[in-house]
Structures are given as C-alpha cells and as structure tokens.
Amino acid sequence: MSFQLTLFSMLFLLIAVVVGQPIQSQNGDLKMQAVQDNSPLNMEAFNDDSALYDYLEQSDPSLKSMEKRWANQVRFGKRASWASSVRFG
C-alpha cells in the first residue's frame, strides 16, 4: 500500500512538472517574432524604443505646453474638483 502511494505520488509529480513547464518559443526575441508574424505580440517588446516618444515631441512642439496647460486647468481651473481645491489650496 505504501509502495503504491509512493509510486502514485511520483507519477503525479512527474505529470505536474511536465505540464507546468513554460512554453519555450524557438525564437526568444519578441521583436523578431513580432516582425515575423507581422503583428505586435505585446507592448513589452517595444518598451525600450524611445524613438516613438521623440517623434511625438518633434512632430508637435506645442504638445508639452498643452500638457502643462491642461495640468494647470485640472489643478486650478474650470476642471478643478473639490478634492484638488482642498489639496492645492
């Protein structure tokens, strides 16, 4: 009885280890895989690319001033809520 229980638990452990293995892709680079599939897999693959943010700032230089103006309106202007007026005075 004890031998059968040990054998059963070893078999169960082996199945759990095999099923629980993460799926390994042949190509570990997500960028390469996304280019080959011609579809973005996950944005984590492209997070290290700062060219997109540089492009946005260069294409519209008023973007930063517009963001700053919007933030001031949210804090002190017509979009200010009761909580922001309490917080910022």
UniProtKB/Swiss-Prot annotation:
One GO term describing the cellular component: extracellular region
Cell compartment(s), UniProt: Secreted
Chain residues in the propeptide: 21-67, 80-89
Keywords on record: Amidation, Cleavage on pair of basic residues, Neuropeptide, Secreted, Signal
Tissue specificity remark: Each flp gene is expressed in a distinct set of neurons. Flp-19 is expressed in the URX interneurons, the serotonin and acetylcholine-expressing HSN neurons, and the AIN, AWA and BAG neurons.
Single GO BP term: neuropeptide signaling pathway
Signal sequence interval, chain numbering: 1-20
Modified positions (Phenylalanine amide) in chain numbering: F76
Protein task: FMRFamides and FMRFamide-like peptides are neuropeptides. WANQVRF-amide inhibits the activity of dissected pharyngeal myogenic muscle system.
Family the UniProt entry places it in: Belongs to the FARP (FMRFamide related peptide) family.
Name recorded for this polypeptide: FMRFamide-like neuropeptides 19
